[in-house]
Amino acid sequence: MTDRLHPTRTIVTGASGELGQAMARQLAQPGAQLSLWGRDGEKLAAIAAQCRAQGALVNVRSLDLTDVAGAVAALLAEDDACPFDMAIFASGLGDIRAQGALVEDPAQVARLIQVNFTAPAAMAAALAGRMAGRNSKGRLVLISSAAAFHALPFAASYAGSKAGLSRFTDSLRIAMRPHGVSVTLASPGFIDTAAGRAVPGARPMPLSPEEAARRILRAAMAGRKGMGRAHLVTPWHFALLRLFDRALPRFLRDRLLRSLAPPGW
């Protein structure tokens, strides 16, 4: 990574996950200040040690983003202490309905929506307003999923929460652009992580966490006047699948999406 891809102070949520860890490693260099948030304290400590070995100054915060108000308060407190140049909201939960069930568990639906949509949207909104008022503008990166493009009957809460985040991010980008704040939406396909491999079903064209992180960070720094790409879909094949989904008659699309469920689901 080149120096221009390393903002001075960055927060990465989901930093105990494999994608978030890859983001942190690629941002870590002498002079970089990283705030790494995640659920797993042991994994946070391990990635923090790696980033410090690369010369970065690192602090960690272990928390559950289902406490949305607490997460926003903690974010603003850290921003008060030392303003963020960049925020990467990479936290997320993935799940499908239980085998044999007609619908997903209501408590799990609520949890996925809080972690995948409500928390990152609220945190991004809180930070965007502050960044807009600064002389040195900031960057926001929100990680959605190619699953947001499709109505997945066996993963309604995951696809739905990511779709909500995608529309929110695009709306925020339009609102913030006149104020010089860059907002990038990333919609990766399958990322080869332990959590992803635990979910039954095919995973075509998987990206390693390191490659996904590299593509997302480059997209965040690209574009006219360095304002970042509005939307990264990677691998590009998933953009074609999105168009295919839109072009199909509804009855054919519904039949196809039902057929994607793992056997027995």
Residue ranges and their predicted role:
Residues S16-G17:
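Conserved glycine-rich cofactor-binding loop
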Residues A124, S161:
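Active-site helix of classical SDR
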Residues S145:
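Residue(s) in the substrate-gating loop at a strand-loop-helix junction
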Residues G94-A110, F154:
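Conserved mid-core segment of classical short-chain dehydrogenase/reductases
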Residues C51-A69:
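Rossmann-fold cofactor-recognition segment
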Residues L185, G201-R242:
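C-terminal helical subdomain
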Residues A32-I47:
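Conserved glycine-rich Rossmann-like NAD(P)H-binding loop of the short-chain dehydrogenase/reductase
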